[in-house]
A protein has these predicted regions:
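N-terminal amphipathic alpha-helix/helix-capping segment at the start of soluble metabolic enzymes
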Residues: 1-25, 36, 116-129
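Acidic (Asp/Glu)-rich catalytic clusters
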Residues: 13-15, 39-44, 73
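Hydrophobic faces of well-ordered beta-strands that scaffold small-molecule active sites
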Residues: 20-25, 50-52, 78-80, 95-97, ...
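Active-site beta-loop-alpha junctions enriched in small/polar residues
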Residues: 25-30, 55, 83-85, 100, ...
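Short, acidic/polar
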Residues: 29-42, 83, 154-156
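Glycine-rich, proline-tolerant flexible connector loops at the mouths of alpha/beta enzymes
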Residues: 51-65
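Alpha-helix-loop-beta-strand connector modules within alpha/beta enzyme cores
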Residues: 61-86, 115-128
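Conserved anion-binding
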Residues: 87-156
Length: 156
């Protein structure tokens, strides 16, 4: 399988630097101007990319505005961290194509991916595979994703 531009960039940075930092911007409680400031400061501090997403719904227009604002101030990749099919913006460079591996709901294992794939292809967004496992309390992502979280203190 041929790697996309963003995935190749991330892997090359990891190989060269041994580890990288990726900043997560949750568009739910932030304005596009605030998001662009976070992205600019993060890039200046050495972050390799900006992830955009969260556990709850944000309007498509707001998500698009946040992605565009971030892209206007940084030249590092933007990677969507989608909460659902509604978390796809045509303005992003890439998207984590996630499967919530400890969900009891098939929708979060493969259903959302099936629904989102045509949009990702249409928008020409680079998909990057990710197996996602919720640990600890699980928080909002665990509740929405119907996950059985892996406890931090699970005995061997």
């Amino acid at each position: 399988m041929m790697l996309g531009r963003v995935e190749k960039y991330l892997l090359e940075k990891i190989a060269a630097e041994k580890s990288i930092h990726i900043t997560l911007v949750d568009p739910e409680n932030i304005t596009p101007a605030q998001a662009s400031l976070v992205a600019k400061n993060s890039k200046n501090s050495g972050t390799a990319a900006i992830m955009i997403g969260g556990s709850t719904f944000v309007s498509q227009d707001h998500l698009d505005a946040v992605v565009k604002a971030i892209k206007s101030v940084v030249d590092i990749p933007t990677i969507l961290f989608p909460n659902n099919v509604s978390g796809i913006s045509p303005h992003s460079d890439a998207i984590w194509f996630m499967s919530l591996l400890n969900s009891v709901d098939p929708y979060f294992l493969i259903g959302a991916q099936i629904l989102g794939a045509p949009l990702i292809k249409k928008y020409n967004i680079e998909p990057i595979s990710m197996g996602y496992i919720i640990v600890g309390e699980g928080g909002t992502a665990g509740i929405i994703g119907k996950a059985i979280p892996i406890p931090y203190n699970k005995p061997e």
